[in-house]
Amino acid sequence: MAVNAAPDCLAPAEIEAKAEAAGVTKATMPFGKAFVLAMFAGAFIAFGGLFFTVFLSDASLTWGAQRVVGGLCFCLGLVLVLVCGAELFTGNSLMVCARNSGKISWSQLLRSWVTVWLGNFVGAIVVVLLVYLAGIYKLNGEAVATSMVSVAAGKTSLDAGAIFFRGILCNVFVCLAVWIGFAGRTVVDKVVGILLPIAAFVACGFEHCVANMYFLPMGALMHAVGYGADVAGAQTLLKNESKY
């Protein structure tokens, strides 16, 4: 008996409809639920950032291996966000699909973005504290701590223009990853689909504002307890977080 198999992925028009429906759901979500889910997303991205810095602590790796494999390590964060249904500020940029179709208002959109941004920040800071208390930075002869400071110092050395445009490029790739995730019909589809866009933006050195909610405080904390190079203070932190 012949069986009509479903296509490998959703068609672009179906993805658009799915993105609009997701935007409506996010815009009408109660504050408490949205904030908690955003905290989870911030924590998940921080987990990806932690995986990335642990990998980078191996000084024997070539530059190319660090960028590409490190990018794949960072993918953990967005995989967890998409599969677990958490609320990520950068991915929620696709809510403009629902706004442009008139299904949500500007006030709903902005309220959601502000709520999720704050929740992401809180979640990332919680992971910073947990990583410190767990002593993860002491791994590999404390090379992980040096890696954490090095990543943060590299980000704070950029000028404002470079940060801004790297932030735009990063979110293009993040939205493409989320779009591909919407296209997938299974968990495997979603995971495989998002790997390359996320690994690519990490390898290219683009700037992800939620990831920096982890990288910069973690690097600053490591410097404060005596590791690595100088990491600039609160003004630089705010400059990096404002890049979106």
Where are these predicted regions, by residue range?
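Alpha-helical transmembrane segments and their helix-helix packing motifs
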Residues: M1-Y244
